[in-house]
Amino acid sequence: MFQLLELIENEEDREFCRKLSEQFDSAMYHVAYGILKNSADAEDAVQESYIAIINNLDKISRENCHKAWNYIVTIVRSRAINVYRRRNRESKMDEDTIENLLQESRGDGEIFELPDGSSMSELIGRMKYPYKDVLYLRYYNELSYEEIATALDTTVDNARHISSRARKKL
C-alpha cells in the first residue's frame, strides 16, 4: 500500500489515503478473505482495491465515514469476486455461489444500512449482488454510471443494465 501512496501527487490526497488505510485496511482484508477464503488471494483483492480507490479518491466522501466505508467495501467485494472468478475460470460459478459468499462476508450488517433506516434501504439490502451494489453506489453515494462502472470494473452499459434490472426488482 505504501508504495502506491507514492503514486499520488497531491499531499492532501496522499494523507487522506493513508488515513483510509489505517482505518479500513484490516476490515478490507476481512471482507476479501470472507469471500475468497485464501489469505494470498485476499491480499491481492485488497491491493487491487487500493489501486481503484486511489484512482477514484475524489468519489470517496471525506465527511461521511459510512459513505466512505460503503464505497470502499463495494470496491473490495467487487475486486474479491473478480479474483475468485479468475482463480476458478475452469469451473463454472453460478450467481448463487457468489451470493452465498457475499452473505458470509457481510459481517454486522451496518455496512449497508442508510443513516435514516428507510424501508427502501432495507429492500435494497435484501437484493443480490450486483444489484445491491449498483443501487447503493448510484443513489446513496450519488455516483454516475461511468463512476460505477469504474468502481465495479465493468462497462458503463452493463452498469446501466444492472441498475435498470435492480429498479424493476424493487
Predicted regions and their residues:
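Amphipathic, Lys/Arg- and hydrophobic-enriched alpha-helical face
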Residues: 21-40, 56-59, 124
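Short, small-hydrophobic-rich alpha-helical interface motif
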Residues: 28, 32, 42-53, 148, ...
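Acidic, proline/glycine-rich intrinsically disordered inter-domain spacer in sigma factors
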Residues: 99-125
